[in-house]
Design a protein with these regions (language model features):
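Polytopic membrane enzymes that build or remodel cell-surface glycoconjugates and lipids
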Residues: 1-186
């Protein structure tokens, strides 16, 4: 008699931000799960497999001041990306499928953030559509399947998270600091 269903539950609404963001995250995981069988390719070998700093317990310090690629002269500096690879090596021993799983989870998180941002700016339907399109767009294949593409995914996460914070009205000092910090990290 009058059981609780998703349709009548007061704590669950179809337009709730989590209800909008979750399908995008699930789709991202489903679409890219096949990459769990991937191996190290191209720059993955230099940056996410053979970099001696990955295998040194104190190697994280070198990422704070040294370049992205070992012994390179290009001056790329991506400490957040490098530190995620270092941490994963320390925690998982560099098992390839786990490195790929992190890229998939990061893409799922960014897809959910895109859905949440579109939901905030244009409503529930727009959020759902934007999140699903972002999750499934083929442009992201390289960033998710190629391990070093993590740099782009982390950048997108910082930018979209900052925009999401900024989209809240009014923009308080605390939120402004959060937006600035997100932009710096990105």
């Amino acid at each position: 008699v009058g059981g609780v269903t998703l349709a009548n539950c007061k704590t669950w609404r179809r337009d709730h931000p989590l209800a909008i963001a979750a399908p995008a995250a699930v789709l991202a995981v489903a679409l890219y799960a096949i990459t769990l069988r991937g191996t190290f390719i191209w720059d993955d070998r230099f940056i996410a497999q053979d970099d001696p700093r990955l295998h040194d317990a104190s190697g994280w310090r070198a990422y704070l001041h040294a370049g992205y690629r070992p012994n390179a002269v290009d001056n790329l500096w991506r400490p957040l990306t490098s530190l995620t690879f270092w941490a994963q090596w320390r925690l998982t021993g560099g098992i390839t499928w786990r490195l790929h799983a992190m890229n998939i989870l990061l893409h799922a998180a960014v897809s959910a953030l895109v859905a949440a941002l579109a939901h905030r700016l244009a409503g529930a339907r727009a959020g759902l559509i934007a999140g699903l399109l972002f999750a499934a767009h083929p442009l992201h294949v390289e960033a998710v399947a190629y391990l070093v593409g993590r740099a782009e995914t982390l950048c997108a996460a910082g930018v979209v998270a900052a925009l999401l914070v900024m989209a809240r009205r009014p923009l308080t000092v605390g939120r402004a600091v959060g937006v600035f910090a997100g932009a710096i990290v990105a």
